[in-house]
Regions:
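Conserved non-catalytic scaffold segment of RNase H-like nuclease domains
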Residues: 2-122, 136-160
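Short acidic/polar capping segments at secondary-structure boundaries
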Residues: 101-102, 130, 153, 174-176
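Active-site phosphate/pyrophosphate-handling residues
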Residues: 106, 129, 167
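Acidic two-metal-ion nuclease catalytic site recognized across multiple nuclease folds
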Residues: 2-4, 149, 170-201
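A short, structured active-site edge motif that brings together acidic residues
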Residues: 121-132
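Acidic donor-binding loop at a coil-to-helix junction in glycosyltransferase catalytic cores
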Residues: 164
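Short secondary-structure transition/capping segments
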Residues: 83-85, 167-171
């Protein structure tokens, strides 16, 4: 599908993953979180969050970084079930993730292959596109750099916990979008394709 522009009236889910490392082929998802945005409004009551039980133990440095321990995931859903639940939450929404082209979407694709889950195509945007559109080649398009530029507070949300990161990212996306299109009618950011599990139910 050729990239095209999209507007904020669309049903959007901003999401984030936490994992045991940076390699989709070698590491595992341990947390998925998402929050819905419609018409430029963050719909906090429509949110999703789950820990995910990996096959291997969570390394200590990942626990130190994310706050997620082996105790958190001990009774969590298996990856296939967690991804199917996330797919049900997403529905027909367009997905947005930060650095998602290089991180989140490859992890989802790899996990669908690993767990033999058939996939469906959804609209997808890497929120770094908003940052690059606003600030061009300036150094730093990470979420912390964007928070500093937008003077955003974390409002007590824990960074590197997917539940906290999606709340912060939703606020950042909303502010960047508003700067690009004050009435949220149009956004000069291309919409690409992502995948999530096909859910027959």
């Amino acid at each position: 599908m050729a990239p095209h522009h999209f507007s904020a009236c669309m049903n959007i889910v901003i999401f984030d993953l936490e994992t045991t490392g940076l390699s989709p082929s070698e590491n595992e998802i341990i947390q998925i979180a998402g929050i819905r945005m419609i018409g430029g409004r963050i719909v906090e009551e429509e949110s999703f969050a789950t820990f995910v039980k990996p096959e291997s133990r969570i390394p200590r440095f990942i626990t130190d970084y994310t706050g997620i321990s082996n105790a958190h995931v001990r009774n969590a859903p298996q990856p296939a079930n967690a991804l199917l639940s996330f797919s049900r939450f997403v529905g027909d929404a367009t997905l947005i993730a930060h650095n998602g082209n290089r991180f989140d979407m490859p992890f989802i694709r790899e996990n669908c292959i690993r767990h033999r889950l058939p996939v469906r195509t959804v609209g997808f945007v890497d929120s770094m596109s908003f940052s690059r559109k606003l600030w061009g080649g300036r150094c730093g398009h990470g979420l912390d750099a964007i928070m500093n530029r937008l003077q955003l507070s974390d409002h007590g949300a824990r960074r590197h916990d997917a539940r906290g990161d999606v709340k912060i990212l939703a606020l950042a996306v909303r502010q960047m979008w508003e700067q690009l299109s004050p009435n949220f009618q149009h956004c000069p950011v291309a919409l690409g394709d992502g995948v999530i599990p096909f859910n027959p139910y």
